[in-house]
Amino acid sequence: MRYPIVIHKDPESCYGVTVPDLPGCFSAGNTVEEALMQAAEAVECYLEGLLLDSEPIPNPKDITFHTNNPDYAGGLWETVSIDLAALAREVTSKKLVSLSKVSIL
């Protein structure tokens, strides 16, 4: 899955990243490159939390859906790619390990 992100910079701050399709998911970095890396990690952590809680995964919208939103005016648009199948396997493995530690299995 590819989630659109918007990178923004205020004069007195580092580069901030917002993920419009994942409410409350944000990140930052000192450079654009660092912001992109941190954004990918933030999206992965956000989705991992949803999977652990058995919550639905929001489908990403096309960037063009968000570009007309005035909240994101002047931002740099990119996408981050997440291998949802691999993440789901990792979460399933974590759940099994957690259950075995409390002798449920």
Predicted features, each with a name:
Residues 19-21, 90-91:
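Short glycine-enriched loop/turn motifs at secondary-structure junctions
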Residues 16, 26, 96:
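Short aromatic/hydrophobic contact patches that present stacked aromatics
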Residues 1-2, 41-105:
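Short, charged, surface-exposed hinge/linker loops at domain edges
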Residues 13, 22, 103:
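A generic "binding-loop/recognition-motif" signal
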Residues 23-34:
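A short, exposed loop/beta-hairpin motif centered on an aromatic-Gly-Thr core
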Residues 22-23, 84:
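Short, charged/polar surface micro-motifs in flexible loops or helix N-caps
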Residues 1-14, 18:
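N-terminal segment of the canonical double-stranded RNA-binding domain
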Residues 35, 39:
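Conserved anionic group-binding/transfer micro-motifs
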